[in-house]
UniProtKB/Swiss-Prot annotation:
GO CC annotations on file: cytoplasm
This protein's name: Isoleucine--tRNA ligase
Stated role: Catalyzes the attachment of isoleucine to tRNA(Ile). As IleRS can inadvertently accommodate and process structurally similar amino acids such as valine, to avoid such errors it has two additional distinct tRNA(Ile)-dependent editing activities. One activity is designated as 'pretransfer' editing and involves the hydrolysis of activated Val-AMP. The other activity is designated 'posttransfer' editing and involves deacylation of mischarged Val-tRNA(Ile).
Domain notes: IleRS has two distinct active sites: one for aminoacylation and one for editing. The misactivated valine is translocated from the active site to the editing site, which sterically excludes the correctly activated isoleucine. The single editing site contains two valyl binding pockets, one specific for each substrate (Val-AMP or Val-tRNA(Ile)).
Family classification: Belongs to the class-I aminoacyl-tRNA synthetase family. IleS type 2 subfamily.
Organism, scientific name: Corynebacterium efficiens (strain DSM 44549 / YS-314 / AJ 12310 / JCM 11189 / NBRC 100395)
Gene3D superfamilies: HUPs, Isoleucyl-tRNA Synthetase, Domain 1
Catalytic activity as recorded in UniProt: tRNA(Ile) + L-isoleucine + ATP = L-isoleucyl-tRNA(Ile) + AMP + diphosphate
Chief site of localization: cytoplasm
Cofactor(s) of this protein: Zn(2+)
Xref: NCBIfam families: ileS
Binding site for ATP: 630
Subunit structure: Monomer.
Keywords, alphabetical: Aminoacyl-tRNA synthetase, ATP-binding, Cytoplasm, Ligase, Metal-binding, Nucleotide-binding, Protein biosynthesis, Zinc
Amino acid sequence: MTEAVGGVYPLVDMTGGSSRFPEMEENVLDFWKRDDTFQASIDQRNDAEDYVFYDGPPFANGLPHYGHLLTGYVKDIVPRYQTMRGYRVPRVFGWDTHGLPAELEAEKQLGIKDKGEIESMGLAQFNDYCAKSVLQYTKEWEEYVTRQARWVDFENGYKTMDLTYMESVIWAFKELYDKGLIYQGFRVLPYSWAEHTPLSNQETRLDDSYKMRQDPTLTVTMPITGKIEGTGANEALIGANAIAWTTTPWTLPSNLALAVNPSVTYALVEVAGDGEEGFVGQQLLLARDLVGAYAKELGTDARIISEHPGTELIGLTYEPVFDFFRDHPNAFQILGADYVTTEDGTGIVHQAPAFGEDDMNVCNAADIAPVIPVDMDGKFTSLTPEYEGQLVFDANKDIIRDLKAKGRVFRHQTIEHSYPHSWRSGEPLIYMALPSWFVNVTKIRDRMVETNQDIEWMPAHIRDGQFGKWLEGARDWNISRSRYWGSPIPVWVSDDENYPRVDVYGSLDELEADFGVRPTSLHRPYIDELTRPNPDDPTGKSTMRRVPDVLDVWFDSGSMPFAQVHYPFENKDWFDTHAPADFIVEYIGQTRGWFYLLHVLSVGLFDRPAFKKVVAHGIVLGDDGLKMSKSKGNYPNVTEVFDRDGSDAMRWFLMSSPILRGGNLIVTEKGIREGVRQAQLPMWNAYSFLQLYASKKATWSVDSTDVLDRYILAKLHDLVADVTAALDATDIARACDQVRWFCDALTNWYVRRSRDRFWAGDEAHPEAFNTLYTVLETLTRVAAPLLPMTTEVIWRGLTGERSVHLTDFPSADSFPADADLVRTMDEIRGVCSAASSIRKAHKLRNRLPLPNLTVALPDSGRLADFLSIIRDEVNVKNVDLTSDVDAVGTFEVVVNAKVAGPRLGKDVQRVIKAVKAGNYERVGETVVADGIELQDGEYTERLVAANPDSTAQIDDVDGLVVLDMEVTPELEAEGWAADVIRGLQDARKSSGFEVSDRIQVTLSVPGDKQEWATRHADHIAGEVLATSFEVTQDDLGEDAHEVLKGVTASVARV
């Protein structure tokens, strides 16, 4: 032990006297606010190249959650890093303000139940309320984002409801329209009757859209009544009953046709005597391959009368299920459709063209117009009087009852299936034919697939996997919403179909030119009030009126890159030269949401991707592995975590996990606290060690010749290079790994192995202090984006300068590289770790010296110059090096059957048996077993100890250590003395002595240990700074300190 001087560091104290990270973080946040450090980080790069980052706008009518927290950390790390790399990185926050989320929240707060109440209130009042409610939690958001040490510009943030933003949105609409990429159509769409609006296909693919639901299924009979002349229908089938299966009985009143597959074989089957009651003797028509699925209903002795290709059914007519539309033109015939399969049902599909996209396509080809007996509330209309006013799902019961009464239900079951629901209200959707405006995505689909190849995805497999496959199947995007609060569809049409005209507007100037007034709002109802006479109507009676729908809120979000800068009305040159963005990040579900629609609009408008690099992270789960739920309480409260462990701890836990590589992550308090131990504490402990022993300011130096200094500086070189490579690739988890491994080498090896030099002081060993200073100053810069507040405290304490976040990221070239030394020293660490594992397994304390350690490595001679380090670290008297690994262990080959099996087939078992029998040899870089060559990855090699009890493998190398654990009386005495020293050090500490205080010691020792105490007295006294050291057997009284069991001591300051 030696004297601790200290007092030089910190040069700037940001701890506020606290040793708790959360309290230090509050001090840092307060400093940043007063200092305006964030703005300074941008201003100092005004002449630098911009790094463009798109921050996906959240809704501010709800509080942030773990998903926002996770994404927010990435959104902070990348800009911080790129700033330190010399770029100017503006970070403007934005708010998503339009759409159903805002309307539903407003309805909830106003107690509104339906659209009728909104219209009674008035659109102006309702939308004004929406405008206020969407910003309800902006203060909480700002506090949350600020507390997580995320630097963003709130003051100049954009809102999608801003007039400038909305003008850019309508510009985009018109630009797409002029390119032939927007059209109006009548198509079957997912429709939310609860919210009175259609949705887009991608909205039904969001995480929460599909839910399990029980629904009735019916198999109904359709009596064949005739054939259409000129078709190839087989008249012999007249009088039979086609049977059709449906999971939506409520669509049967709208049935207008049946569909069969021309390539499928159908069977005419007679129901046997023990078949379904009421159908015995009837002849039923269904796909031959599905006859077995109806074995129970058809009866034991049911027989196939005849078989017919699907082409013989096409053109047959049948008796309608209901009479509502009996006279509908061209209806109630069997049509051909390739989409019909024999995977389930009967192979005959009922067609209700108003409620199924495939049905619509098939019936359109046969000139059968759809009928729509369902209103915007999802209820039946007067077209079906028996069910008028009933919600379609509620009507199932009555429809089934009526069909059974008619004898038309052959089978009635209940199915539990995954069914789409509204992602906002949670109510089940229906599919219904509606007029709508569409982006013609299919027209640019191939180009979208092509430009996706220019995007760098993390994880990489998403490019051609989840995102690429979605692009390949992309469909036209329905952008109409029959709602109130949103960007308007900027289309005006004539209100007289005799004088048709369509005008599309893309700017305030164009609107002002035609309507004579410049809009101050593009929201409803104000935009709806703009009307003018139809220029194409010579009578002057018709009027141009805006179509009532608003745009899908995702059109707003997808317009963010250009709309946030009011393109093309402002910042045109800037945007044209700064797109695509360098980087974006959101969770993986956005491959069908924001990522996708950014890509659609960018390719459609600019023929390029919207972003160059993207991270699609996984999902944060509760501590039970399930979705986070406030009612279940299955996740740590964020505020409590911030108060207890700090934001940096949470940041490290999330960023170092597999979630940034697309995996999911279970959040636990234990995991967060473990994050503190991985990087924050090691860094802080190394800094505190320097604080404790430095008597003067250290200086930057990489010139030390000491082997430990050379090692840690070479490790520092590798750290900077590896973290730079990882963050350049946006592999944040890998960057965290590198920092964690370095911190382990720094504190658990370098500082510990260098303690004697530090205890001797900076006059005796300035190179040690300068090296540690250099390492810490560099390490804090490397880790600054990952632990922004912890590193700020340490870096300012070390340097006294303004902020670590105003510095440049280190260059690996600033440090000496020494790959051989790093490899050798890391092997030594591995040797010591392996030896320690043997001690631990045998419960041999580290202070007990052992006689010998044998190190077996193929090139063990490289360790010869470092035996003293190994001896001291492992606490052995001798270290033997040998290159004869076979003397202490053997290499075994293990076949990876899962990998080798597909290639080797049945020979894989032969190879496994040969390997187990030792019938194999290594040939070059491969293994040959029983004459069969195994390829890389099809096998692994492992080193097995000859005596596992005293042997352990060295990590990451083909080597073993063998520990001699025979304890002699001399070694036991020496270990006892070391234990006494440790006990006396504890006594010094509990007595409140300073590290440098000299003391007097009286040690009371049992008679059998007197000789040990006397033999090692000088050593013990020297270690505990005792100027007087007396050994006795006397009782030292109640105030004595227990040093060991049966050993007490009195200590006094000199």
